[in-house]
């Protein structure tokens, strides 16, 4: 009741692309992305062209997709750099600021869970008139919280010649991120088929991890026979890795033990079959404030929340899925006349769930529901 908002610092955030700020896990400061001071007015289109639009053909055959709203000339490039350029700034709760690294087209500036490092992704030239910005060159590096370079993970080159296909990806390491369950461990994915889904091979992708201080060899975590599509970290013994293949509408989920590198496929289905959708694992925040798998008291059962498609319409549900036995128990499902979804589980032991409920006659509201006795408050 006595709290009030205050202005922390006056530098405007650059919110045009990506996440503009991240809280550190100790809640003592933020890593922000700000507009560069003194950047001036936007560039103006000259009435005199500087010259023709030039594109190089280096003699390589490459299939090219058709995209909308690409860069088309040097003026587009100037506008792109003007609006996208940013400065990473650390700010504490007293408003004291410190610049981190150099200004650039910052794609990502995510601190590690323990707050000691920053995963920095910077888009750089040469730009392309053939592909969107996520195919532009990207320098991926780790800085310490003071802004000092620690390790360069990869300088991803311009990707104009990726094979045609929904499951085609760039070759080499990609999809870098922090392990949510550890203080400072990077994970990334690398294609085993050169990124070409038409190549016949047993495995498509491999996931690796790299521990701080990042000067050791990466450790392989799991090989996937389909294209990597995501990972949810639990703890040192549990992670769920997802893969999919667009051409056959297939998705798989693997139970992986990050400690001993064992892996077991636990879900294999068509992602277009909504009736058989097992839902998504529910998460909880760990000591770093990062989402990790929410486990029941036995430490090997996860809670799954889904839309619950049925002939009567969507009836959202919560299931318990035992990762050892693979047995599923439905512990709650919405009932007409309400549409009610599980937002989070407050207490996995007492099974107290926060839900959002609405109907034709009631506006959406939030409730605490006991899944043991059915009481709602």
Model-identified regions with their sequence ranges:
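Beta-propeller folds
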Residues: 1-375
């Amino acid at each position: 009741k006595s709290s009030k908002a205050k202005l922390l610092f006056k530098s405007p955030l650059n919110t045009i692309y990506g996440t503009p700020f991240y809280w550190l896990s100790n809640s003592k400061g933020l890593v922000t992305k700000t507009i560069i001071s003194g950047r001036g007015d936007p560039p103006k289109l000259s009435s005199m062209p500087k010259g023709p639009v030039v594109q190089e053909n280096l003699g390589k055959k490459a299939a090219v997709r058709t995209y909308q709203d690409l860069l088309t000339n040097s003026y587009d490039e100037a506008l792109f750099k003007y609006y996208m350029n940013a400065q990473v700034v650390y700010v504490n709760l007293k408003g004291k600021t410190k610049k981190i690294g150099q200004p650039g087209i910052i794609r990502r500036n995510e601190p590690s869970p323990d707050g000691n490092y920053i995963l920095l992704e910077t888009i750089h030239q040469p730009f392309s008139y053939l592909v969107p910005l996520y195919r532009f060159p990207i320098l991926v590096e780790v800085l310490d919280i003071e802004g000092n370079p620690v390790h360069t993970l990869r300088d991803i080159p311009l990707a104009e010649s990726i094979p045609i296909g929904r499951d085609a990806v760039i070759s080499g390491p990609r999809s870098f991120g922090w392990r949510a369950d550890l203080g400072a461990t990077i994970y990334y994915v690398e294609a085993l088929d050169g990124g070409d889904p038409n190549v016949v091979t047993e495995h498509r992708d491999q996931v690796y991890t790299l521990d701080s201080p990042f000067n050791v060899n990466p450790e392989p975590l799991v090989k996937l026979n389909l294209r990597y599509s995501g990972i949810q970290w639990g703890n040192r013994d549990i992670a769920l890795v997802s893969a999919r293949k667009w051409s056959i509408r297939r998705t798989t989920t693997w139970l992986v033990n990050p400690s001993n590198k064992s892996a077991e496929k636990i879900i294999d289905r068509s992602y277009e079959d909504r009736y058989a959708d097992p839902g998504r694992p529910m998460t909880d925040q760990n000591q770093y404030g990062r989402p990790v798998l929410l486990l029941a008291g036995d430490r090997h059962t996860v809670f799954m929340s889904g839309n619950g498609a049925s002939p009567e319409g969507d009836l959202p549900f919560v299931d318990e899925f035992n990762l050892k036995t693979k047995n599923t128990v439905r512990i709650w499902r919405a009932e007409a006349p309400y549409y009610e979804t599980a937002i989070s589980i407050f207490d996995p032991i007492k099974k107290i769930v926060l839900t959002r409920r609405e109907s034709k006659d009631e506006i959406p509201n939030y409730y605490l529901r006991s899944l043991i006795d059915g009481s709602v408050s």
